[in-house]
Amino acid sequence: MCPFFSFLAPLLERLLAIHSLNRIYAEVRQRLVDLEQDPAFFMKTLQVMGTSVEIDQQSFERIPRTRPLIVIANHPFGGIDGVSLGALLSMVRPDSRLLGNFLLSRMDGIRGNIIKVDPFQREGSAQANFAGMREAIRWLKRGACLGVFPSGEVSSFHFRSLSVADPVWSSHIVSLALRTKATILPLYFEGNNGLLFHLAGLVHPSLRTLLLPREFSKMEKKTLRIRIGRPLSPELLSLMGDHPVTTDYLRLQTYALAKSAPGKIPLRQIKLPFWATQTGKDLSKTAPPQKKEVMSAEIAGLPASAQLLVYGNFEVYCAHVNNAPSNP
């Protein structure tokens, strides 16, 4: 081995916090009761790190305890958010798994807790992901729970929106929910990775990836805050259909949970993703105005599942034309 590399390697390990990651994993591994699948793997990781998760009790009770469930979330940290999601779901849904990077399956204790996918778009990735989706369908059809980060990669800084947000979400989540008649539950992680992480990503995405262990270890003895939204029923998703706008709606429902106080959303946290602000799109025409009394009566007659979003004085509904004849 080159003497210079022998000198440099320990410095790089400390700079990238590889030594901290190895220390955490070694201690977690000592606590495992099953090297293939330890149901408490995620919880034990949080305990070793001294990391706590803060959730509002009322919203915690919204998590459905039975039937097929897909929990979707933003991915601001690229590590600790996955561990926290796994720990949260294991508390209320012993039948839960995460849709995760196949590289994680090399770690003891976690293999049986994830359904493997390959996010690297290399030769063989499509076949691996097809197998992963088939396994996810079988899992959900058993009435189980699946945690998913629809972006498939960590949030990053976008110049167009001048904000940190997930990249474009995969539309496969909608297809998965429709095929399995699963409920979807949006969940929002507060916070972001550090400035150095995002500056490195502007130079090259690989530099951002190299800093993920550093960001993970920085969460030791920290508190992670999670906001949980309202469950979205299979009936509502079926009404909306398998369209890109449905994926956009799921993303909006997730990021709308970012509000820091009732009735207020910090503008820097809820900006639209950069691809949604591009010009040149053909926008649907707005329906002509209708009589207020007629619309009020029709809205009052809609089922509760037709309500998509409530924010301040605004309410958004989705209804079949048969239930809203005055709005063709």
Regions found by a protein language model. Name each.
Residues F130-C318:
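Non-catalytic C-terminal accessory region of glycerolipid acyltransferases
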Residues A87-S90, V164-D166:
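Glycine-rich, phosphate-binding/catalytic loops in enzymes
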Residues R14, L46-T51, R122-Q127, L162-S163:
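Short, flexible loop segments at the rims of nucleotide/cofactor-binding pockets, characterized by
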Residues M1-I72, G82-S84, M91-R93, R111-G112, ...:
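Membrane-anchoring hydrophobic helices of lipid-metabolizing enzymes
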Residues I80-A87, H172-S175:
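Short amphipathic alpha-helical face segments that pack within enzyme cores
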Residues S90, P94-N129, M133-A136, L140:
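Conserved nucleotide-cofactor-binding alpha/beta core module
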Residues I70-I72, K116, G147-F149:
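Structural motif
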Residues H75-G79, V154-S155:
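Gly/Ser/Thr-rich loops at beta-strand to alpha-helix junctions
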